[in-house]
Amino acid sequence: MTPETDFDDVVICLFDGEYHLGVAALTNSLVKYQFKGLINVGYRGGVLPLWVKQLQPLSDNYFRISDDVTIHFKQVLSNMHLGYFKPFFIKETFDDYPAAKKFYYFDADIIVQAPWMLYFNWVENGVCLCLDSAFHFIHHNHPWRKDWRALVKGRDHLLNPTFQYFNSGFLGIDRNNIILIDRWIDITNQFIKKNGQINYFIKDSHSSVRGDQDLLNAVITTSSDIEINVMGKEAMGFSLPATLMLHAIGERKPWNSSFIVHLLKYGNKPSTTDKAFLSICKYPINIFSVFRYSYKKIDLLSTCVLGRFLG
């Protein structure tokens, strides 16, 4: 096998800063659930994560995770928010690995919770998408959708009367549907031309475009010719039981949380995602030092016990 070419399945991820800890957790979960292939990671900054030293180097920023999994790091030079950069990096990955057939983008705060064969089969039937947690239902005549249509020219005949709104943290796609990525790039460029802000996410809850997720949904809204294969909120663990993955949405992440502080200050008990994250921190990548792992484990267990007493 040559690292550059011989992969059928490619997982794609982007990170900067401490999100490298999420990439390590995602990697561990992929190995646990029998993924075989390449993990192509785009990173911002000049230094690879320290945990890379645990891996066997191959060549040109390729490292062996296991007999079946290789990870590659590619530096991102763009200044745009990594969310908006998603379709561009996905397209780069398509181009860099022409022999690969199936591609799966994951945000760096997601971990896999189901056998990989389910993902593999899922992509067989169209572009794979998951409903969002908060805005999973948006009417096909919602003002946001009308704003999205205004960003797209020449596809009025392809309007999709969907009521669904999708989370952009995961996307499964095969090479035959690359047109979706091309359209996502095109609509991002149209947004930029209209002076859209792509260096950070807009906090205004009334805006029709606050981040890359809205632009992905704009593409779906104007692409009735692309078959999509949708799972509900349970797919990302937004409703339980979670079926495929767990998505740690929000600013608080399992790797940067003091569970006991969040319980006492905000009344938030450790989530299913928090517990699952800590359970995959040790293999094949040791995400934390022995001391920090022990501290976080004690923090989690003591918070769970205290949470039962507090109700």
Feature-to-residue mapping (PLM):
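A short, glycine-/small-residue-rich helix N-cap motif at loop->alpha-helix starts
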Residues: 78-86
